[in-house]
C-alpha cells in the first residue's frame, strides 16, 4: 500500500493547490516591501508635513492668534486710530468749510470799524479846525487838541468878563467886525500878560 501511495501519480488538482499555496508565499515579500515603502513614504510625508506645518505653526504661534487679547488690543487701537483719523479729517473738512466765512466776516468787521474810525477822526478834526478859527490865536501857537479846548474855555471866560464890564461901547456892539477884532486883540494881550499861563498851570 505504501508503494502505491508513493508511486501514485499526483493529480493536476493537487499541483494547482500546491502552486496556489506557494504563490501567496512568494508574493508576500514584495507586498511587505511595498507596504514598508508606503509606510516609509507616509512617514516621510508626515514628517515633511509636520516640518512645514511646525514652521507655519511656529509662525502663527509667534504672532498673535486671532482670538488672543493682544491682537484684540491692537485691533482696537488700530480701529481707534482709524476712527480718530476719520474724525480729524472730518473736523478739518468742517473747519476748512467754515474758515473762509469767519475770515470774511472778520474782514468786513475790520473794514467797517476802520470806516467808522475815519469818519469820527474826520469830524473831530473839522470841529477843532472851526474852533481854532473862532479863538484868537498867536502866530507862534501850535496847539494840541487839549490845549485848544483849554484856550476856548479861557476865551469864553474872557468874553463873559468883557460883557460884565462897562468898557464895551454901543458903537462897538453895533459893528460886529470891529468888536471881534478888538476882542481878539484884547484876548491876545491878556494871554501875553500871563493870565493864560497862570490858568493853564491850574
UniProtKB/Swiss-Prot annotation:
Changing residue 95 to G: No effect on negative regulation of transcription from E-cadherin promoter. Subset of mesodermal cells. Residues 108-159 form the bHLH domain. CDD domains: bHLH_TS_TWIST1 (cd11412). Pfam families: HLH (PF00010). InterPro entries: bHLH_dom (IPR011598), E-box_TF_Regulators (IPR050283), HLH_DNA-bd_sf (IPR036638), TWIST1_bHLH (IPR047093). Residues 1-18 have a biased composition (Low complexity). GO terms for cellular component: chromatin; nucleoplasm; nucleus. It is linked to Saethre-Chotzen syndrome: A craniosynostosis syndrome characterized by coronal synostosis, brachycephaly, low frontal hairline, facial asymmetry, hypertelorism, broad halluces, and clinodactyly. Robinow-Sorauf syndrome: An autosomal dominant syndrome characterized by craniosynostosis, asymmetry of orbits, flat face, hypertelorism, a thin, long, and pointed nose, shallow orbits, strabismus, and broad great toes with a duplication of the distal phalanx. RSS is clinically similar to Saethre-Chotzen syndrome, with the most characteristic additional feature in Robinow-Sorauf syndrome being a bifid or partially duplicated hallux. PANTHER family: BASIC HELIX-LOOP-HELIX TRANSCRIPTION FACTOR, TWIST, TWIST-RELATED PROTEIN 1. This is Twist-related protein 1.
Amino acid at each position: 500500500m505504501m508503494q502505491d501511495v508513493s508511486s501514485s501519480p499526483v493529480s493536476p488538482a493537487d499541483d494547482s493547490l500546491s502552486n496556489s499555496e506557494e504563490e501567496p508565499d512568494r508574493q508576500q515579500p514584495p507586498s511587505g516591501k511595498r507596504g514598508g515603502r508606503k509606510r516609509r513614504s507616509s512617514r516621510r510625508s508626515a514628517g515633511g508635513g509636520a516640518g512645514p506645518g511646525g514652521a507655519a505653526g511656529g509662525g502663527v504661534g509667534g504672532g498673535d492668534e486671532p482670538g488672543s487679547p493682544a491682537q484684540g488690543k491692537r485691533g482696537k487701537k488700530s480701529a481707534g486710530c482709524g476712527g480718530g483719523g476719520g474724525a480729524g479729517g472730518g473736523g478739518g473738512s468742517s473747519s476748512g468749510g467754515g474758515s473762509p466765512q469767519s475770515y470774511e466776516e472778520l474782514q468786513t468787521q475790520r473794514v467797517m470799524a476802520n470806516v467808522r474810525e475815519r469818519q469820527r477822526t474826520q469830524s473831530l478834526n473839522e470841529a477843532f479846525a472851526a474852533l481854532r478859527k473862532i479863538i484868537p490865536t498867536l502866530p507862534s501857537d501850535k496847539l494840541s487838541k487839549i490845549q485848544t479846548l483849554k484856550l476856548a474855555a479861557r476865551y469864553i471866560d474872557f468874553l463873559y468878563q468883557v460883557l460884565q464890564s462897562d468898557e464895551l461901547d454901543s458903537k462897538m456892539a453895533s459893528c460886529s467886525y470891529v468888536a471881534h477884532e478888538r476882542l481878539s486883540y484884547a484876548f491876545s494881550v491878556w494871554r501875553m500878560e500871563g493870565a493864560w499861563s497862570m490858568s493853564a498851570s491850574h
